[in-house]
Curated annotation (Swiss-Prot):
Disulfide bond sites: none
Membrane disposition: Multi-pass membrane protein
Taxonomy of the source species: Bacteria, Pseudomonadati, Pseudomonadota, Gammaproteobacteria, Enterobacterales
InterPro entries: P_starv_induced_PsiE (IPR009315), P_starv_induced_PsiE-like (IPR020948)
UniProt record, GO biological process: cellular response to phosphate starvation
Name of the gene: psiE
Protein name: Protein PsiE
């Protein structure tokens, strides 16, 4: 097995980075389309007369923010020199668990466990934003 020369390794790295960037751009376009569809859905739910539409509206808002956070994560990836900041994944995790609590709140024990998971993620976020771990 021969070792690859430095220019060849850099070329392979550049090709893979380009493929990754194009994939993320495609994903971003798909998320923007879904964000637009969710906006239309939220407008429909907002003007629906049913009582259950309030829960659908809140759930739709949280899903809207999830799309928004994923788009912001991709934007931050390109702005920060092709790396994903950890705290954006934590934000997405918190929002996803909040959505889960809103949608599935039948079991008090499950809600307590989800709340503990949110607390753990908030502590993680606090640790990531401390001076020792701050990169930005």
């Amino acid at each position: 097995m021969t070792s690859l020369s430095r220019p060849r390794v850099e070329f392979i790295s550049t090709i893979l980075q380009t493929v990754l960037n194009l994939g993320l751009l495609c994903l971003d376009l798909i998320l923007v389309v879904f964000l637009g569809k969710e906006t239309v859905h939220l407008a429909d739910v907002l003007f629906a007369p049913e009582q259950t539409s309030k829960y659908e509206l809140v759930e739709g808002l949280v899903v809207y923010f999830l799309y928004f956070e994923f788009i912001a994560l991709i934007v931050k990836y390109f702005q920060s020199g092709f790396h994903f900041p950890l705290r954006y994944f934590v934000y997405i995790g918190i929002t996803a668990i909040v959505r889960l609590i809103i949608v599935d709140h039948k079991s008090p024990l499950d809600v307590l466990i989800y709340s503990a998971a949110i607390l753990l993620l908030v502590i993680t976020l606090w640790l990531c934003n401390s001076k020792r771990l701050k990169r930005e």
